[in-house]
Amino acid sequence: MAYSSRSCDQCSHERRSGFMKWLCAFLKGTKDGEANRRRPRVTAGEETTLWEEPVRPKKEEPPRHNNEEMDHALALALADDAKNTKERNHDKGENDEELARAIQDSLNMNPYQPYNPCAPSQTQARSRGYRVCGGCKHEIGHGHYLSCLGMYWHPQCFRCSSCRHPIREMEFTLLGTDPYHKLCYKELHHPKCDVCLQFIPTNRTGLIEYRAHPFWGQKYCPLHEHDRTPRCCSCEKMEPRNTKYMSLGDGRSLCMECLDSAIMDTGECQPLYHSIRDYYEGMNMKLDQQIPMLLVERQALNEAMEGESKGPHHMPETRGLCLSEEQTVTSILRRPRIGANRLLDMKTQPQKLTRRCEVTAILVLFGLPRLLTGSILAHELMHGWLRLKGYRNLKAEIEEGICQVMSYLWLESEILPSTSRYGQASTSYASSSSSSCRPPPSKKGGISHTEKKLGEFFLHQIANDTSSAYGDGFRAAYAAVNKYGLRQSLNHIRLTGGFPV
């Protein structure tokens, strides 16, 4: 009986041991790898960071068939304990402690932990293996990380390509493979108006619309073309908000760069005028008559145009005139003073022009830069040369075209004195003369970089003029002079009234 009693006690202990093992396994739940299944990725931003998001469990009632499986598993465990009573002998205290730990672990499991988009799960930490940061090139251990651009990053290593500060926002801008804060990208790449200095707004269709000068590249909002923003009458640049242009008092404004070399009165312009006459003489195209030259205001030039019966070929904005009729013209006698962004104490004088030949005088607007004033003089002197040499009744495209060629060639002689592309064309007329070389530039000591750039703009204006008489006429005249030379082209014009083809 004693043996039988011990056997029952041992059987009871072992049954309880087997049951506790099964209960521990049941309370432990499924394996971590099964609980943390594939997690969807959340995309943040534009072509952006990929965050790892765990699947949150839903509150559902356990299926009924789970209870049947539990009863079946309990029966198997009891049968197994009875079969192996002689092989198992476990201490009661250890079994109780193991059961307590299992219950405690089960109670500590919280299926509704706060969601952290940057925190990887334990399964991910084990499965991702060795990861290298795309920024510092060091291993990414446990903790927060970013997945973007096909690489992994420490949060502090994923930085803006402009300001170099970490990108912590959920949205950012990607240019190629370079990430930017959205504001940094806007500062770098969103066009700003060069006039109001603000970001150019979008139009009704959401597109960024702006105007840009074809030569200077100055960008500005379309509204500045209609809000009376001053525009330089010489270089065509619009006045920025942080700069003041000089008002010439006749509706024209002048930027500071153009004002630096502006010619303001008739006496100041005489040396330039005589240097251009010398340029013509060096081309074997000497003007035999002394033609007066006057600098005038805009109103005086317009009045002289109205009184001129000949020469209907004028640009929308006329800046020079070759007179053939006797008139009284008011010229600028003394250079005005500059004060408070306007001209002061301008002294003018009326002057009666008497006709002594086919040309009465040459008039040019005052206040223009030296190179622009010179190109206008070269153009108007060619009108005078044609009239003095007996060229009559020429079409507008022919006369204005060949005059523009002379203006173009003089400008080139000033800004490209030794490397002119048109050197051969401009000297071909003087091939029979001993003076076959291009005259030196009229400004001693050369010109500044700013003035040279301004001269290149005036060349660009002549070459790209869209008008029929001045634009098409110049291009046809240039092609003829470039192909046949200036002398042969002029002879052909005298005989046929047109350019050689």
From Swiss-Prot:
Q: Region (Disordered): which ranges?
A: 33-67, 429-448
Q: Which PROSITE patterns match?
A: LIM_DOMAIN_1 (PS00478), LIM_DOMAIN_2 (PS50023), ZINC_PROTEASE (PS00142)
Task: Kindly state which keywords UniProt assigns to this record, in alphabetical order.
Answer: LIM domain, Metal-binding, Repeat, Zinc
Tagged with keyword Transmembrane helix: no
Q: What happens when the gene is disrupted?
A: Mutant plants produce grains with reduced size.
Keyword Hydrolase (UniProt): no
Basic and acidic residues: bias regions:
53-67
Question: Which CDD domains does the annotation name?
Answer: LIM_DA1 (cd09396)
**Record-annotated UIM domain positions:** 65-84, 94-113
Q: Which GO terms describe its molecular function?
A: metal ion binding; ubiquitin binding
Q: Which residues form the LIM zinc-binding domain?
A: 131-191
Relay the record's extra comment: Plants overexpressing HDR3 produces enlarged grains.
The domain-related comment in the record is: The UIM domains bind molecules modified by monoubiquitin or ubiquitin chains and promote coupled monoubiquitination.
What does the record give as the function of this protein? Answer: Ubiquitin receptor that functions as a positive regulator of grain size and weight. Functions in the same genetic pathway as GW6A to regulate grain size. Modulates grain size in a similar manner to GW6A, by altering cell proliferation in spikelet hulls. Interacts with and enhances the ubiquitination of GW6A. This stabilizes GW6A, delays protein degradation by the 26S proteasome and enhances GW6A histone acetyltransferase activity.
On subunit structure and binding partners, the annotation says: Interacts (via N-terminus) with GW6A (via C-terminus).
Q: What is this protein called?
A: LIM domain-containing protein HDR3
Q: Which organism is it from?
A: Oryza sativa subsp. japonica
Q: Which gene encodes it?
A: HDR3
